[in-house]
Amino acid sequence: MSKVAVLLRVLPDDAETKPEELYKKIAAALPEKYQVAQYQAEPIAFGLEALRMVILMPEETEGGTEELETIIQSVQGVSQVDVLNVTRFSG
């Protein structure tokens, strides 16, 4: 089964929320078919840090990244989810 790698930027709802906290909440909320391949903090401004994530998902997922975005958006502490890139992953 082929997979795609989805690069996301997740913005917290306030500057007090740390990227590591968001990562833990998001990872716990994701179903098994999604796999976090990489994550890192991205400084934005005035102490606000976004979370950049690469998530692997099945290529055949109905609706593309919509389900993934909805799941992450529903996590407490998440303000916004931006899909930055989607590419086929072989490995």
From Swiss-Prot:
UniProt keyword list: Elongation factor, Protein biosynthesis
InterPro entries xrefs: eEF-1beta-like_sf (IPR036219), EF1B_bsu/dsu_GNE (IPR014038), Transl_elong_EF1B/ribsomal_bS6 (IPR014717), Transl_elong_EF1B_B_arc (IPR004542)
Family annotation (Pfam families): EF1_GNE
Superkingdom of the organism of origin: Archaea
Stretches that traverse the bilayer: none
An annotated Gene Ontology molecular function: translation elongation factor activity
Similarity comment: family membership: Belongs to the EF-1-beta/EF-1-delta family.
Described purpose of this protein according to its UniProt entry: Promotes the exchange of GDP for GTP in EF-1-alpha/GDP, thus allowing the regeneration of EF-1-alpha/GTP that could then be used to form the ternary complex EF-1-alpha/GTP/AAtRNA.
Protein name: Elongation factor 1-beta
Lineage, top ranks: Archaea, Thermoproteota, Thermoprotei, Thermofilales, Thermofilaceae
